[in-house]
Amino acid sequence: SPTLSEIRALADALQISVSELTRLPVPAPANGETDSTKEAVRLALMAVNHGYPGGVVLPVETLRARVTAMVGALCRCEGEREVGAALPALIQDLHTSIAAGRDVAELLKLSAWLHTQATVPWLRLAGDSLDLREQAIMLAGQAAGEHGTPAPIGLVAAAGASVALEVGAFDLAQAGLDVVTMPTNTPETMQLAGFLALRRSTVAAADRRSGDVDAPLEYAAELAARTGEGNAYGLSFGPTNVGQFRVHGLVEIGDYERAVSIAEGLNPDAQDRARQAYYWIDYGLALARLRERHDDAVRAFRRAEAISPHRVLRDPIVRDVLAVLLRHSRRGSPADHELRDMARRAGLPV
């Protein structure tokens, strides 16, 4: 399975964009109404960017409740289709309310939170072509800049780095993180500071700067020891999350045996369900690199799919790993049956 750095290197060698290598097939797997919903989100973002959001002016309390419910549903992997269906109207209503000029400071904070913790994650879940996520990051960045306080700016930096990583823009991801200084004087900002440190470690691992991986991880671990397991801003930051990012970084730099060893010492149930799904994905990616653990890799991916099908079936790296596992699978084994069923659901040739 290719790592982010390997995908970037291949794209450079072929003189194409990373997004061309990671594009989903048409029709996309696990589709339902996902593609039509993505188009509705696209139109909502376009309307806002053109200055005509076309929503309804609503009280800040109503909008806060809707944003909170949406972020919470994504953290719990509940009603992901319904979240997508509700997202365009929420984008339009929130930005229409900002334009109306009442409670603007609070609404700007909500805009940064909505786009970084709901719009971008849902679009990633849906397997978009990254341009929509970049539009959402730009809107969040504008809101955070106007608000001018550390937390919204930090949320944008973390989400922006994630999007930049996926297109192989490692320098851009690092630059966005370098300009952020996050205070740790509240439990919420302490968790956000820790999460930003985790993101810095991920960027270093993807960029093959192995000497820069451990320091931010250790800082995050220090903060996690003080915060315990938390979920400020929907980040699910805590000791387990630090361990999971450590696993992810080890997969990126190619230390698969150590990644598996650390993963097997974690308790994914200590996190929200979205992070649980990513735990099983990262664990599966590491297992898939160990020839004698392929069956375990299949079972790990199946655990992730049971929590959130889209996170497996629409993820380009996981799809590539499933295809590789298929080529090496032992016909007739229990894991082979599970693998082939999963591959069919992903739209892969079996």
Residues of each region from the PLM?
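Short C-terminal boundary/hinge segments that cap the last helix of small helical domains
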Residues: 15-30, 242
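Short, charged recognition helix plus adjacent turn
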Residues: 23-54
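Onset of an N-terminal alpha helix
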Residues: 38, 60-64, 336
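TPR-adjacent "capping" and linker segments in tetratricopeptide-repeat scaffold/adaptor proteins
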Residues: 53-61
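DNA major-groove recognition helix of helix-turn-helix/homeodomain DNA-binding modules
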Residues: 4-20
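Conserved binding/catalytic microenvironments
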Residues: 66-350
